Amino acid sequence: MSAFEIEHLASCITAHAWNADRSRVALCPNNNEVHIYAKQGTSWVVEHVLAEHDQLVTSIDWAPKTNRILTSSQDRNAYVWTFKDGQWKPVLVLLRINRAATHVKWSPQENKFAVATGAKLVCICFFEEEHDWWASNHIKKHKSTVLKVDWHPNNLLLATSSSDYKVRVFDAYIKKADGRSVTRPYGEVAFGEPVFEFDQCASWVHALKWSPSGSTLAYSSHDGVFAVANFSTNPPTIEKLRVRNLPLRDLLYITENSIAGVGYDCAPLLITNQNGWKYSGEMDKASEGGAAAGSETSARKLFQNKVDLGESKSADKKLTTVHQNCITSIVPFKSVGGVVSDFSTSGLDGNIVVWHVKALEAKNKFKVI
């Protein structure tokens, strides 16, 4: 079995998301549109084009239970798309922001969602039945652009990463969405007040992700710092690791003790918990049939060659990795009980790659734990 399957669907992909049965994928080809591809035989063909946004689409999330697509854009808007009568119908979300929407995420129960923004705030959005629209409450404790958001499995806590170098955890309880009978993990915290705030990074915090159990929160920043906050203690303990690779743009828990990271190195890397979090190597050391990777990462080698040799001697050389440019997102493709057996990545090279974890383990001699 091949370690990966690759599809070239655009000249550049900035975000992608799958539907529940993985028969369709929604992606942004680096413009104001979202293209929905469907598998027909051995080929992927464009089935729908969502073109309501005016500027670059920054994020896509496809709810598996309700089959609703959530999109955000630099045009300061977010839309909830519902499939009806053979067409995707958009509903504008009332965000009330004056800067770009940077990232969106449905809550686990899909009764609300979070929108990160460049307006130094996060919108917690919920559906108001009496008005038939998606309204929002604002969390305003950030000092700069919010880059990523991620929901805790309990549907109440929300983690945010920001360009003010901090990671924050908020109680995002909304009475109209969550009801009155829920048990809030940290008591009656006022909406918008951070429960925890972490400042171990010295640069933009690009990515963060909760573990499947919600007991740990991993995040990474532009200065090469990777950290994990362990919430089994109170206050949480922080374990920090500085990876030698280029900065990570996105993270994914493969298991509770194994995390895949992607970014400017053009290859997924693995970090595992072996009595402490440690860098375990690249999951894509070289493409099948390609030259073996050296001691340096492929992306760093390419840029160094450009400096040493000039553009004409390196510009037309292919990287030894599957992706040929920065990887912008990583999402689970197949998972059972919090264990991911397959995951997909998309990048600025226009490729979507589905990776098979067991085949990667056999090929590259590493172990997911």
UniProtKB/Swiss-Prot annotation:
UniProt KW keywords: Actin-binding, Cell projection, Cytoplasm, Cytoskeleton, Repeat, WD repeat
Subunit (UniProt): Component of the Arp2/3 complex composed of arpB/Arp2, arpC/Arp3, arcA/p41-arc, arcB/p34-arc, arcC/p21-arc, arcD/p20-arc and arcE/p16-arc. Interacts with carmil (via the region between the LRR domain and COOH-terminal proline-rich domain); carmil is required for Arp2/3-dependent actin nucleation. Arp2/3 complex, MyoB, MyoC, and the alpha and beta subunits of capping protein all form a larger complex with carmil.
Main location group: cytoplasm
Sequence ranges of the WD repeats: 8-47, 52-91, 141-180, 200-239, 322-365
Matches recorded under SMART domains: WD40
InterPro entries to which the protein is assigned, alphabetical: ARPC1, WD40/YVTN_repeat-like_dom_sf, WD40_repeat_dom_sf, WD40_rpt
Disulfides per UniProt: none
GO biological-process terms attached to the record: actin filament polymerization; actin nucleation; Arp2/3 complex-mediated actin nucleation; exocytosis; phagocytosis
GO CC list: Arp2/3 protein complex; cell cortex; cell leading edge; cell projection; clathrin-coated pit; cortical actin cytoskeleton; cytosol; extracellular matrix
Function recorded in the entry: Functions as a component of the Arp2/3 complex which is involved in regulation of actin polymerization and together with an activating nucleation-promoting factor (NPF) mediates the formation of branched actin networks. Seems to contact the pointed end of the daughter actin filament. The Arp2/3 complex is involved in organizing the actin system in cell motility and chemotaxis, in phagocytosis and macropinocytosis, at late steps of endosome processing, and in mitosis.
Localization terms from the record: Cytoplasm, Cytoskeleton; Cell projection; Cytoplasm, Cytosol; Cytoplasm, Cell cortex
Pfam family, one: WD40
This protein's record includes keyword Cell membrane: no
Molecular functions per Gene Ontology: actin filament binding
Protein name, as recorded: Actin-related protein 2/3 complex subunit 1
Family: Belongs to the WD repeat ARPC1 family.
